[in-house]
């Protein structure tokens, strides 16, 4: 109660007035027509008065208020203009949103008066906005106080204390958004704040282990992509080589001339993809645990086989680096300082083509092995859910 | 206790350095228009490896296991990574020195010998293994068990002592 009597300052909210300074330019005309109609103007004035002069007149009956409205025109005009603005901006929304709530709070106090009073509730809620905003910050605590106030006050002090008990129980809270106050459900606000609390509580569950696990899974995705891409690239490469070389490798000089710009870039790309694929395949068998890896390999586990094939392909591919560079620097044998002496072509290219073919086959096979069960990942099982027996709670969390 | 945000940051830095390493290993042979380009790439690559070594050791120091004085346990668990990283670092530097030495005058000439080819293959293979082991270690160090006393830690300690 004491709090409510302190409210008077609220009646002249400094912030809204600043807002109004900007707004009037666009909207004043709309408001004036409204205020000019006798009923409406009287009501609005009345509202203003009760709201604004509440503190000093706290004990006076409402009828006096209406008399005063007529006596003090100037100040009221100013306030009048202010209030409509507020109405437009905030209360219009409020009307639509919470028609039932407003009557509840004010209805009891105001009913003795006539029609205009019905609007009163809206005004008052406006006036209470600053307070409500304040409460919005401390929703949990204030709500309890509000309920008790409402129950005790309304019937006993029906006429006189209109402003005091009324404003509190509003279901709406006015939140300032982009320089306007907008109605929001108190219940919703509480919910959102609760949600925030909940999320704060949940955060700790996102542990470093989860980060590691998500990174591991992300890398596995990259690995799955690189397996397929590598297989496709290798097959494409070998097809291009055989097409360029002609029937039974009869046109090797043509192959060299055409392929020399491609040789080194492809070698680089092959290494990149092979490295990614090999690491990814190692991940799947948890290569670091040698005993497990060897056991899996001996058991002809597809993942272990794929890892072995990838590693072999990597070694073979790397061993052709020198030849690739030689192809890259190809100049016809007639040119001075050529690396390609007459007749050496077939001797150099034959093994190179065979190795490329083998690499393509190995890579294709590995891809088949791995794509047979793309979801299987031994290192995830071993690294992240090991010792489940010792830590049943953690183990469950991780395995899920 | 290791903070999730800190760990994420460190992990992303490690992966950044690893991917740079992979990139240079893959495409340095292509980017040899001028010897200086390769030189800079190689220097940064070596520094990246060095940084990665420093980071992984800092992560070790940050574990409860290390702070409790169980260095041997840590070394036992991650000796593969430590040794391999050191070997890879040595191989990288030697290959870089050799290649730059051969190519400094003319970056576009054929410099390959059997020795260089062998070193090249070993260095690149070590790079793949290093990438795998380092990644695995970095991910494993996210395990909260390394940052608190636990039954698991005690049992591990007993195993190592035996």
From Swiss-Prot, chain A:
This is Transmembrane protein 237. Residues 54-71 have a biased composition (Basic and acidic residues). GO terms for cellular component: ciliary transition zone; membrane. Part of the tectonic-like complex (also named B9 complex). Interacts with TMEM107. Belongs to the TMEM237 family. Keywords: Cell projection, Cilium, Cilium biogenesis/degradation, Membrane, Phosphoprotein, Transmembrane, Transmembrane helix. It holds the Pfam family TMEM237. The lineage of its organism: Eukaryota, Metazoa, Chordata, Craniata, Vertebrata.
Swiss-Prot record, chain B:
Its main location: membrane. The chain crosses the membrane at residues 7-27, 41-61, 80-100, 115-134. It is found in: Vacuole membrane; Cell projection, Cilium. It comes from the Eukaryota. GO terms for cellular component: cilium; vacuolar membrane. It holds the Pfam family TMEM138. Keywords: Cell projection, Cilium, Cilium biogenesis/degradation, Glycoprotein, Membrane, Transmembrane, Transmembrane helix, Vacuole. GO terms for biological process: cilium assembly. Glycans are attached at residue 6. It is a multi-pass membrane protein. Belongs to the TMEM138 family. Required for ciliogenesis. This is Transmembrane protein 138. It comes from Bos taurus. The lineage of its organism: Eukaryota, Metazoa, Chordata, Craniata, Vertebrata. The gene is TMEM138.
């Amino acid at each position: 109660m004491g709090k409510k009597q302190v409210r008077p300052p609220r009646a002249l909210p400094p912030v809204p007035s600043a807002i109004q300074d900007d707004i009037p330019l666009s909207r004043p005309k709309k408001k004036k027509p409204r205020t000019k109609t006798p009923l409406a103007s009287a009501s609005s004035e009345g509202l203003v008065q009760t709201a604004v002069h509440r503190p000093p007149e706290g004990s006076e009956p409402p009828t006096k208020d209406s008399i005063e409205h007529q006596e003090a025109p100037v100040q009221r005009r100013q306030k009048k203009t202010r209030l409509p603005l507020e109405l437009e901006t905030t209360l219009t929304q409020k009307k639509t949103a919470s028609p039932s709530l407003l009557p509840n709070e004010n209805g009891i106090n105001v009913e003795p008066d006539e029609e205009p009073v019905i609007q009163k509730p809206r005004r008052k809620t406006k006036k209470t906005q600053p307070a409500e905003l304040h409460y919005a910050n401390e929703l949990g605590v204030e709500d309890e106080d509000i309920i008790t106030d409402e129950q005790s006050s309304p019937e006993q002090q029906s006429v006189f204390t209109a402003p005091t008990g009324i404003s509190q129980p509003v279901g709406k809270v006015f939140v300032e958004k982009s320089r306007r106050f907008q109605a929001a459900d108190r219940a919703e606000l509480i919910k959102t704040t609760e949600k925030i609390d909940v999320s704060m509580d949940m955060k700790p569950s996102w542990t470093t282990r989860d980060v590691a696990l998500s990174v591991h899974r992300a890398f596995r995705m990259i690995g799955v992509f690189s397996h397929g891409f590598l297989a496709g690239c290798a097959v494409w490469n070998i097809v291009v080589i055989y097409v360029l070389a002609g029937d039974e490798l009869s046109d090797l000089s043509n192959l060299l001339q055409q392929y020399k710009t491609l040789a080194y870039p492809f070698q680089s790309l092959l290494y990149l993809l092979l490295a990614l694929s090999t690491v990814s395949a190692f991940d799947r068998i948890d290569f670091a645990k040698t005993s497990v890896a060897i056991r899996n390999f001996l058991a002809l586990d597809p993942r272990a086989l794929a890892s072995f094939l990838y590693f072999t392909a990597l070694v073979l591919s790397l061993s052709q680096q020198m030849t690739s560079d030689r192809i890259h620097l190809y100049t016809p044998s007639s040119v001075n300082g050529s690396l390609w002496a007459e007749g050496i072509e077939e001797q150099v290219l034959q093994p190179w083509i065979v190795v490329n073919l083998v690499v393509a086959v190995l890579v294709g096979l590995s891809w088949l092995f791995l794509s047979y069960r793309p979801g299987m990942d031994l290192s995830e099982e071993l690294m992240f859910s090991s010792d489940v027996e010792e830590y049943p709670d953690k183990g469950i969390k991780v395995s899920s | 206790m290791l903070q999730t945000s800190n760990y994420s940051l460190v992990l992303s830095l490690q992966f950044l350095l690893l991917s740079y390493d992979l990139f240079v290993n893959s495409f340095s042979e292509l980017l040899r228009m001028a010897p200086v380009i390769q030189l800079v790439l190689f220097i940064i690559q070596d520094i990246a490896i060095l940084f990665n070594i420093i980071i992984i050791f800092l992560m070790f120091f940050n574990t409860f296991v290390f702070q409790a004085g169980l260095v041997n346990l840590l070394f036992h668990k991650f000796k593969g990574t430590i040794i391999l990283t050191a070997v890879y670092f040595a191989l990288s530097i030697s290959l870089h020195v050799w290649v730059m030495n051969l190519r400094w005058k003319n970056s576009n000439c054929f410099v390959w010998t059997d020795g260089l080819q062998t070193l090249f293959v070993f260095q690149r293979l070590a790079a793949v293994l290093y990438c795998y082991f380092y990644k695995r270690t970095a991910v494993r160090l996210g395990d909260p068990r390394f940052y608190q006393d636990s039954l698991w830690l005690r049992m591990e300690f007993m195993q190592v002592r035996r």
